[in-house]
Amino acid sequence: MNIYEVGPRDGLQSAAVKLSTEEKVQMIGLLHDAGLNKIEVGSFVHPQRVPNMADSEDVFREVSGLDCELGVLVPNKRGLDRAKSVGAKKFNIFLSPSETFNQNNLGADLKTIFSNYRSMLYGVPKEDIRVYVSHAFGCPIEGKTDTDTLSEMLSQCAILGDNVVLCDTVGTANTDDMKEVLELTSDIRSNWSLHLHHNYQRHEKIFDNVQVGYDYGITEFDSSIG
């Protein structure tokens, strides 16, 4: 079982309380000391869009000596170039079967996003790319994606990166939803992970979803420090 810790990025990017660069570096160091060997440490997005991630270059420089895998989110070519300039080697991208999500977060439709990522990641080793599939189990606006469309999308994701992460972005998936999507992965060659959000109205159910993932052979799960 592997844990991929996303707290310094996903946990902090929308937090009401902004941590200083020094506090982020300390957090990442403590996570490393606790035994976590895969940590997402920042997001190279435009600082006006996500102010809490504006210091990602500085954070990465300070933690780059840690003996663990350090991942960073890079939604576009500019972000990738910034990440490379400070020595980042592991790059995380995101997209969704939900076109509403794609337009709101990446400013393009799914077809264009795939094209942009293929161009942007040319020359980056596939094993260094992690692909987040947001709203993989359904979008609160658009509902569920039909299985044929989702299967084709997941196949394209598996071509982009060596690790594809299925995200229950709003924490509403149940065990049947999990099984329906995980069934699609059996014929697609990739390393699959799960990113399950906590929903306080059904907090006990998340462990049922973890068990389903484990039963389907998932051995890497995202976590986020509270």
Model-assigned labels for residue ranges:
Residues 1-44, 50-67, 159:
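Conserved N-terminal beta1-alpha1 strand-loop-helix module at the mouth
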Residues 37-63, 95-109, 135-142, 165-175, ...:
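Glycine-rich, proline-tolerant flexible connector loops at the mouths of alpha/beta enzymes
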Residues 97-167:
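Conserved anion-binding
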Residues 4-6, 89-98, 130-134, 217-226:
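Non-cysteine beta-strand/loop elements that form the S-adenosyl-L-methionine
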Residues 167-226:
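Catalytic alpha/beta core domains of metabolic enzymes, predominantly
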Residues 11, 31, 83, 91, ...:
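Conserved, mostly hydrophobic/aromatic
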Residues 4-25, 68-77, 102-107, 135-148, ...:
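Active-site mouth loops of central-metabolism enzymes
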Residues 49-72, 111-130, 156-157, 178-194:
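Alpha-helix-loop-beta-strand connector modules within alpha/beta enzyme cores
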